[in-house]
């Protein structure tokens, strides 16, 4: 799915087609949608990397200035699965005309922006927009960690009361989520450090 947005003076508006200085959000794009992005100057490799579930957080910059930022963000799979919270790669692609986000999943991080809940958001200030996405991803990690801690605390109370294997297995599920989060945050830290060193990445536009 492809979605297009551009801000006016007050709100973020959804568009029917891409225009200069818009935000393009790609969620598990089809082959035709990937080709459409390529026709807009987005490297196919950047799209492919962003959709690879095992992709690590990193930065890549082309000679023409097009930049790929890959970070891992939290994703809630549901309570009745082996690992309730995992992380997925989010690609942020910056060109001279667009900011493009690419992810296999529909995530809370991106939906907050798409819903128009982010104040003073400018699609023309692409680098700043990217930084706000990164900040939101960090906030989502904190929110999900609080939720995990709350669940684990409740499971510990049940464990002390019952000493049943069920509670132990449930706690193990959330322990796996801790591991995923720790690995992702370490990768993101290195990627953010590299962003701070990019000469082409201006923090204020």
Could you say what each language-model-derived stretch is?
Residues 1-204:
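Peripheral, non-transmembrane regulatory/ligand-interaction domains of membrane transport proteins
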């Amino acid at each position: 799915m492809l979605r297009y947005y551009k801000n006016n003076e007050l709100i973020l508006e959804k568009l029917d087609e891409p225009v200069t200085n818009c935000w393009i959000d790609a969620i598990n794009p089809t082959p035709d949608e990937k080709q459409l992005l390529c026709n807009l100057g987005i490297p196919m490799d950047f799209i492919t990397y962003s959709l690879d579930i095992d992709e690590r957080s990193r930065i890549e910059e082309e000679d023409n200035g097009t930049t790929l930022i890959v970070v891992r963000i939290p994703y809630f799979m549901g309570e009745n699965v082996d690992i309730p919270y995992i992380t997925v790669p989010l690609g942020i692609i910056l060109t001279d005309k667009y900011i493009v986000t690419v992810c296999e999943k529909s995530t809370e991080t991106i939906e907050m922006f798409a819903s128009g809940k982010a104040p003073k958001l400018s699609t023309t200030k692409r680098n700043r927009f990217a930084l706000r996405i990164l900040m939101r991803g960090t906030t989502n990690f904190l929110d999900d960690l609080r939720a995990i801690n709350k669940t684990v605390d409740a499971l510990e109370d049940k464990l002390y009361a019952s000493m049943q294997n069920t509670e132990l297995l449930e706690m193990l599920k959330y322990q796996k989520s801790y591991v995923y989060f720790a690995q992702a945050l370490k990768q993101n830290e290195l990627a953010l450090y590299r962003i701070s060193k990019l000469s082409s990445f201006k923090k204020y536009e």
